[in-house]
Amino acid sequence: MARYRTTISVLIVTAALFIGACDRTNQFPELKKTWGQQELLIGLIPEQDVFRQREHYMVLKKYLYDRLGITVNFTNLSRYGNIVERFTAENMDGGFFDSFTYALAHNQLGVEALVRPVNLDGTSTYRGYIFVRKDSGIRTAAEMKGKRFAFVERATTAGYLFPLAYLRENGITDPPAYLGGTFFAGSPEAVIQAVLNKEADIGAAKNTIYDLLAAENPRVEKELVILTSSSVLPLNCLALRRDLDPELKSALKKTLLDMEKDRNGTETLRRFGARGFIETDNRDYEYLYRLSAQVGIDLKTYRYKNE
């Protein structure tokens, strides 16, 4: 009798595993195709400490491998301003682009936006902030005359394009002549630290990084003040090269969009720092294109390297 019960138990467990595998294949019909030999190289723009950022994306790598059998290799880009060259030179398949680098890559390389994350607070957009130290005496564009401005990179929206538009709206058409100096810090986090440490009088960065640092470092709220913010822009999107296998694109998109529907996906999202993913496309970047036109930037020919 004991042996009979053991046999029945084994059969039940085996059946459950088989049904689970069938359900998984039915839920993700693209698994019927073998993706095991596929390797994708995805670039990551520099927003935070490189080790923290890499750890952030490793959980997503594991999930995609478990669900689709695809090996996704992430590579950290040292600067925003070299993504187009590295994309081509290293035969990248895609990237998690911020709004400006996406617009550049879309216009110069033809990449296609796929999905973007939804933050834990339910937002899928960000804003640009312009900020100063509270003790700087600066509260308007007029008071920025002769002051030092820290930008992120020439290839950023919140960290360069938006502040250029802000200055132009306030009658400042030649920032280098008006300001007391400018420099490119390389990342939003570095800009914030530069203003905190009085290496710059004014800074510009995206609100997501600013708010994250404010939650970790009480000095941000205590010592800095935000002067103005931009309209909303899409969060960093996953965009892939145009000629990538359409079935593979579809599989990736469906898997990311459906993550919140299964337990492993929910846990991966929690560790990734997102509630889920939503669809995105080029139409979501209308505000960025307006800013570019406002300051006279042609994205097809823009020289985005820092000088």
Question: Model segments located where?
Answer:
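Bacterial N-terminal signal peptides that target proteins for export
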Residues: M1-S9
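Bilobed "Venus flytrap"/periplasmic-binding protein-like clamshell domains
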Residues: Q37, I42-Y65, L77, F100, ...
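Short helices/loops that flank or line small-molecule/ion binding pockets
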Residues: G81-G95, Q108-L109, A142-E143, S187-T208
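A ligand-binding cleft/hinge motif common to bilobed small-molecule-binding domains
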Residues: F96-Q108, P163, R168-E169, A194-N197, ...
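Small-molecule pocket liners
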Residues: Y126-I130, P234-L240
